[in-house]
Design a protein with these regions (language model features):
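Phosphate/NTP-binding elements of NTP-utilizing enzymes
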Residues: 1-173
């Protein structure tokens, strides 16, 4: 029997799924049925890493569903999330046209996608059904963005899934 050989890209992706140390509050958060979860936790508390993994698992497991990740600016969301999400979603296995560097979108073969959005222009989130997502650094987002842009996107009715209610994590310190 020969040993399985992995490419350097595969190894990087697998290493990115390192084991996390579970904290009781993090486990409570993950188990909570709340639709909107406000997570005011200190720096280095693991909130962003937990969210990255939650959304990566959902986009891989839930077919035909668009997800979003947002931060106050496009530069911020790209810096905090883009490289990690490409690793967590094993994008090296996808055709090149499934990853859009200009749109900051990952499209998976199951029909689901993750789009990174800068909320310096919160209208970017409007007009599409969102299955779920999260906003990092929520305290720095424009005060009107939740009511005028984010909440309506989460409440967009999808006739193919009439009972589904989109979820959102709001992360901050």
């Amino acid at each position: 029997m020969t040993a399985q050989k992995f490419s350097p890209a595969q190894i990087r992706c697998m290493q990115r799924w390192y084991p996390l140390k579970d904290h009781p509050e993090q486990l409570r958060l993950l188990a909570s049925p709340a639709r909107f979860k406000v997570i005011p936790a200190g720096r280095r508390s693991g909130k962003t890493e937990r969210f990255k993994r939650k959304i990566a698992k959902d986009v891989l497991a839930v077919p035909d569903s668009p997800f979003f990740i947002a931060a106050p600016t496009r530069a911020q969301v790209k810096k905090i999330y883009w490289e990690d999400m490409k690793l967590l979603c094993f994008t090296h296995l996808l055709p090149r046209d499934c990853v859009s560097e200009s749109e900051l979108t990952i499209r998976l073969p199951n029909g689901s996608s993750i789009t990174l959005i800068g909320l310096d222009q919160p209208q970017r989130i409007e007009g599409t059904f969102c299955a779920g997502g999260g906003v990092d650094e929520i305290a720095d987002v424009k005060k009107t963005a939740w009511i005028e842009n984010i909440s309506p996107a989460l409440d967009t009715y999808n006739p193919l899934r009439p009972d589904y209610r989109a979820w959102c994590w709001l992360l901050g310190v």
